[in-house]
Curated annotation (Swiss-Prot):
One of its GO terms (biological process) is jasmonic acid mediated signaling pathway. It comes from Oryza sativa subsp. japonica (Rice). Residues 115-173 are annotated as: Interaction with the F-box domain of F-box proteins. This is SKP1-like protein 1. It comes from the Eukaryota. Its main location: nucleus. SUPFAM superfamilies: POZ domain (SSF54695), Skp1 dimerisation domain-like (SSF81382). Part of a SCF (SKP1-CUL1-F-box protein) E3 ubiquitin-protein ligase complex. Interacts directly with MOF (via F-box domain). Interacts with rice black streaked dwarf virus RBSDV protein P7-2. Is able to form the SCF complex together with CUL1 and the viral P7-2 protein. Interacts with D3. PANTHER family: SKP1.
């Protein structure tokens, strides 16, 4: 057990063999890792065969930011508990939204790898953020624009495409 004031550290091992020492609270943002810690499977490090070191470092950066922002917000709320200002959300909420927006300004391959990692590690906030980013990339675009954005080849014949448009006319209105 970690001594008073000392933070317990967890070792995460990426698919390419790199090891990351992270605070237990940060690692527990992942429900997958949380269950491993709760089941006492974290003593020799936690192998993450589906996440490479580049993506794992980004995931840790996200979890770190969110854990410390939540702690700061809780601390601020405790300080303000006696005053009417307690009902007002801490200013860090807007800062965190801006940080999140900057965090997902990455190339498509990294974004998709972050989605896969967030899903595998069961980090709801990160999965929601990354999926919403992809949804925003699609919103308001024609099928042709979406194909171009994501480099998707159109393998429909003109006849098949027309049939799909006819069957799904409601979606194109």
């Amino acid at each position: 057990m970690a001594a008073e004031g000392e933070k317990k550290m967890i070792t995460l091992k990426s698919s390419d063999g790199e090891e990351f020492e992270v605070e237990e609270a940060v690692a527990m943002e992942s429900q997958t890792i949380r269950h491993m810690i709760e089941d006492d499977c974290a003593d020799n490090g936690i192998p993450l065969p589906n996440v490479n070191s580049k993506i794992l470092s980004k995931v840790i950066e996200y979890c770190n930011k969110h854990v410390h922002a939540a702690a700061a917000a809780a601390s601020k709320a405790a300080d303000d508990a006696a005053s009417a200002a307690a009902a007002v959300p801490p200013p860090s909420g807007e800062d965190l939204k801006n940080w999140d927006a900057d965090f997902v300004k990455v190339d498509q391959a990294t974004l998709f790898d972050l989605i896969l990692a967030a899903n595998y590690l069961n980090i709801k906030g990160l999965l929601d953020l990354t999926c919403q980013t992809v949804a925003d990339m699609i919103k308001g675009k024609t099928p042709e624009e979406i194909r171009k954005t994501f480099n998707i080849k159109n393998d429909f014949t003109p006849e098949e495409e027309e049939e799909i448009r006819r069957e799904n006319q409601w979606a194109f209105e």
